[in-house]
Every structure is written in C-alpha cells, then in structure tokens.
Amino acid sequence: HIQAGHVRVEMNGIAREFERMFSPNRNVLTNADGYKYSQYLQYPEGTTYVASYIETRVGAKHSRILWCGLQAFLKETLTVRITKKMVDKMAKIAKSAGAPFNYDGFMRIVNEFDGRWPLRIRALPEGAVVKPGTVLALVENTHPDFFWCTSFIETMLLRAAWYMTTVATVSKDIYDLCLCTLVEFTDLKGEALEMVLKFMLNDFGARGASCHEAAVLGGMGHLMTGFRGSDTTEASEGAELYYNHN
C-alpha cells in the first residue's frame, strides 16, 4: 500500500518509497516548451537513439560549478506517471494552439510502460565541484521507438538543475571567501572555526522566492555548500526527502 502523495520507484535495483512535497496530480506533459510538441516530426527517418547532455557554458562568470538538483527532479517530476487523462488534456491544449502532438506515442507510454518515461539519466554525483564545460548529466532513450522523449524533458530538467546549481555555486564561492577570511584574520581553528563558518551566511531567501518550490530548491542549494544557517524551513524538509539528510 502506498500512501497518497507518496511514490514507489526502483533505483539501482532497490525499491524505495518516498513522499513528494508538491502536487502529484499536475500534468507533467505541459512541463515543456511549446516547440517540443512538434519536435518528434523533425528527426531524420530511421532515428532510433538520441543522447543529450547538459553542461555549463565555458566563459561563464564562475570558474567552478557546484552541481546539484537532479535528485529533486527525478523524485518529484520524472516519477510522475503519464496517464490517459494527461495525454487527452495535452492534446486539447495542442489543438487550441494549432500545434502537432504525438498522441499515439504518449499513449504507448501509458499502455506499454505503465506511464513511465523510457529514458535513462546518468550524471555526476551531486555535490561535485567541476569546471565549466564539464558534462553534468546525460539523457538517453531506452527503447528505439521513443528517441523523441530524450529532448522532450529538456525544459523541465534544465529548470530543476540550473536554479539549485546556481544558488549552490554562488553560496560555495561565499563559503570559501568566509573560510579564507577567518583563517587570515582570526585565531579560530578546528571545531571553533568550523562552527563559526557554518553560520556566517544565513538563508532568509524563502520570503523573496518566486514560489514554494523555488524556496525549497534554492534553500537546498545553499545547504549543499557546507553552510548550516537557514530559516528556509522547507529546504530542510527537502534535504531529508530527496537526499536522506537531516
């Protein structure tokens, strides 16, 4: 028995049940750019495999990137099962916009894969600090008929990853600056230094976030750096749900 608002998934061969923080009833098919709905028609005939990767652009402001955000996306969004109701609703939206829609393709996912995306995502461990231009995650289809699914999730994946990664990267730079300042200008050492450092930058970002979800992701990004001072309570809940950290 799975409780309402919970989802059961298999990861690395182990079945796990976890709770979602946000609505499990939203239509995941609307979570894409408008041009994505016609993109399946634009691939060359005979295409069976598409692999797409995400990376940070070389020449960006930061010389290193703290990568994070994937677990929240996987557990909160990609595990939402596609249903006939979602497909029918999206077909109606596409028709009103005069856009093509792969109704038969999505219905095959509903009927043949129990609503699960036929995709595989491989990625660097979250929390990794890498140079710009490093591949962070790779998405690929697991069935030759569903090569078009790879790029369909681009919008939702990038939004989930970049916001949390950006906050974490900025906070990491500040964390390291605070560490250097303490080492150079104080006599603190060991546990005393670590305790002061953890709480030098407190997160009050929840009130300025655009929505609850942004507060969770941004707050978790801040906590990824080593800082522990946070008044964004929902970020602590997210860290426990998505990363088993309390």
Predicted segments with their positions:
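Universal eukaryotic N-terminal targeting presequences
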Residues: 1-12
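Residue-identity detector for glutamine
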Residues: 3, 39-42, 71
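Poly-acidic low-complexity segments
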Residues: 8-10, 33, 69, 102
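Buried, small/hydrophobic-residue-enriched core segments of structured protein domains
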Residues: 14-61, 109-118, 122, 127-246
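Low-complexity, highly charged intrinsically disordered N-terminal segments
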Residues: 46, 50-102
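Short, positively charged
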Residues: 101-109
